[in-house]
Amino acid sequence: MIKHKRLRRASALFAALSALLLSGCAPSAASDSALPALTVGSDTYPPYVYMDNNGDITGLDVEIAEEAFRRMGYRAEFTTIDWEKKTELVDSGEIDCIWDCFSMEGRENDYQWAGPYLVSRQVVAVDAQSGIETMSDLAGKTIAVQATGKPEAIFLRGGADVPAFRNIISLADRGVQYAMLDCGYTDAIAAHEEAIRQYMKDYGANFRILDEPLLVTGIGVAFSKNDTRGLAAQLNEVFEQMREDGSMEKLVGKYLDDPAHSLEVDALEQ
């Protein structure tokens, strides 16, 4: 009988200790959820931002944002937006920032920027069996791009360094351009290189990326020009910390097969 009492006491003590240990592990998640939220406007753009099999938003930019904002005393709350209305949304305060592999090139004066925190190449992809080998081969061809994206701006701007294409198809849903190339409805597409590679990996698409990039650019986080909270400056400081302590490299390596090029931010300034 005494042994049974001791056993029950030991079991109760173990249960109490377990509860204490579990409650000790919980504050991190609980404290994060209690932090004030910053609403991040984004679009679906694997591997940077996408929905996993559980229906949760994840990706490289999501994890960087969560870690960076946590260090600033905030939590990141991602929301999918109409990409064509991104500037209107951030200026109205409906979202706090735009964060989704967002190219800074040519938009330097449109927002308050944090970044660049990574490097991205804007490239052209064609069907693997296509006879298009160089940019000059795009003359007379149809190219699909995302509306208001950087490739659209490059092609519509024109110039000596831009091929004399026949037609540009601008799409509100950036994912549609991949399907169009896959089905032969366009001769080429233009987008961030890692996004194209992710589509090829996920769907087994037989694309070929042209060697010559359209643009090598820094990607950043855009806040409204009228924002007075100093968030862009704080985020720049955190990005520097994350580069120095290796956490940025660790996160990039989790999503990209060859992370080294994406981390060469300093080379952009040379």
Regions found by a protein language model. Name each.
Residues S42-T44, V119-V126, R197, K201-E240, ...:
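Periplasmic-binding protein-like
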